[in-house]
Design a protein with these regions (language model features):
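Acidic, Ala/Val/Gly-enriched low-complexity intrinsically disordered segments
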Residues: 2, 13, 19-32, 36-38
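Non-catalytic nucleic-acid substrate-recognition regions in nucleic-acid-modifying enzymes
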Residues: 40-173
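S-adenosyl-L-methionine
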Residues: 41-62, 78-95, 179-225, 241, ...
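A short, flexible beta-alpha/helix-coil linker loop
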Residues: 141-143, 194, 338-342
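Conserved S-adenosyl-L-methionine
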Residues: 209-324, 347-348
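C-terminal catalytic and target-recognition region of SAM-dependent MTase-like enzymes
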Residues: 319-322, 326-409
Length: 409
């Protein structure tokens, strides 16, 4: 069994659970045209928006609220139906998705020769460009084809020999093959770099929360942009910047490039028109972050400046005991305190959580609280009246949950 050539196959570095895409199987003849009609902007195909396990229903709500058709939560993400314009919009508009995959084809294969044959029928010419390098990532689970490297090689060879596109380990365009229970799903990663990389954040703290996760936690707390938000342990400012961008109706993908710009289906003029549609507004309130670390405050201010929302935010250095609500109506306090990863740390952190709870309970009447914690015991050390927590979500090698309150008395 031949193995992949060095530099062309990266292995199953990313694993996405497959769901059956829309589209016929096509024929072997006329490869360049045979399936092309399936992947045009006038046809619906399946689009998969990935998120962290546990956050699928929250992402589905966001996707549905932004007008995408047939949003459905599935393990690991959300599926929608649409064409290439919907792929572009999903990358540009959706805050909570980690990446956007276009489902190119789906078929059954029980051995490598069958995979090779079916891979040559995929409508590569309607998706990939012959002058743009690509790479392949593959994963196998519960299938008679079990060698992901050999499977990836078959896809790579099919693309090179039918389309002529070069393969490179550094390629921005990634073709993804998932074989599960002998069912093969072929997708193209249309995002490139993960979507939490908004394009503005150069400064981060030691344990950053990804912007995608922060936006979904804000949504879980009922935030829609119309109320103030305060983070008393703001780190590099992720919660506050996301809240300000939501309030200002700024597209999260406005400042970055995407892998779909290198695909055969890309229309630069249509994309430019889409980007030029203005939805921004001036928020009716401001967003506040504080942290005891002066370096964190400097990072937050720099990130807010690069994001273009510095005028809607305020960051100041201070301890938990110095936190007070800003003037105006109540809103949302959202905070991501230290988790205490090492043995013994959790006990040392209990006083911090108690102090946080005392400050919020005594000064923030009418405000709601969202607290991210890996240990229910630490969350409840605040003494705050939490509702049942959300499901555990993987984050930084741990599993964290969002603990929420209603308006504090």
């Amino acid at each position: 069994m031949a193995l992949p050539r060095p530099g062309c196959y990266w292995g199953p570095a990313l694993l996405f659970l497959s769901v059956s895409p829309v589209g016929s199987e096509g024929t072997a003849a006329k490869l360049a045209q045979g399936h092309a009609d399936e992947m045009t902007d006038n046809q619906n195909f399946e689009i998969f928006l990935a998120t962290l396990p546990g956050l699928e229903p929250v992402l589905r709500d966001e996707v549905g609220s932004k007008g995408f058709k047939q949003a459905r939560a599935v393990p690991g993400g959300v599926t929608i139906k649409g064409g290439w314009p919907e792929v572009w919009r999903a990358n540009l508009w959706v805050r909570g998705a980690g990446r956007v995959l276009a489902r190119v084809d789906s078929f059954r294969a029980v051995h490598l020769a069958q995979l090779d044959d079916r891979a040559r029928r995929v409508p590569w010419a309607s998706v990939l460009r012959p002058d743009i390098p690509f790479r392949v990532e593959a994963s196998c689970a519960g299938s008679r084809i079990y060698h992901s490297g050999a499977a990836a090689q078959r896809i790579e060879t099919a693309i090179r020999e039918t389309l002529g596109a070069p393969c490179s380990a550094e390629a921005e365009v990634t073709v993804m093959l998932r074989i599960e229970n002998d069912h093969c799903t072929v997708s193209v990663d249309t995002s490139g770099e993960p979507l939490h990389k908004r394009g503005y954040k150069e400064a981060i703290n030691a344990a950053p929360m990804r912007e995608t996760m922060a936006s979904l936690f804000l949504r879980q707390c009922g935030f829609d942009g119309g109320e103030p938000v305060l983070d008393p342990m703001c780190g590099s400012g992720t919660f506050i910047i996301e809240a300000a961008e939501i309030a200002a109706r700024l597209n999260p993908g406005r400042a970055r490039h995407f892998a779909f710009e290198k695909l055969a289906s890309f229309d630069p003029e249509a994309w430019q028109r889409m980007r030029e549609v203005k939805s921004a507004r001036i928020p009716a309130t401001r967003f506040h972050g504080s942290d005891r670390d002066a370096g964190a405050i400097a990072m937050s201010r720099a990130n807010a400046e690069r994001a273009g929302i510095a005028g809607y935010t305020e960051f100041r250095q201070g301890t938990i005991s110095e936190v007070h609500p800003p003037e105006g109506p109540p809103g949302l306090v959202i905070v991501n305190p230290p988790y205490g990863n090492r043995i013994g740390d959790k006990g040392k952190l209990a006083p911090l959580y108690r102090a946080l709870g005392q400050v919020l309970a005594s000064r923030f009447s009418g405000w709601r609280v969202g607290l991210v914690a890996s240990e229910p015991r630490l969350a409840h050390a605040t003494g705050l009246p939490f509702l049942p927590p959300g499901p555990p979500v993987p984050h930084g090698g741990l599993r964290v949950s969002l603990f929420r309150t209603g308006p504090l008395p």
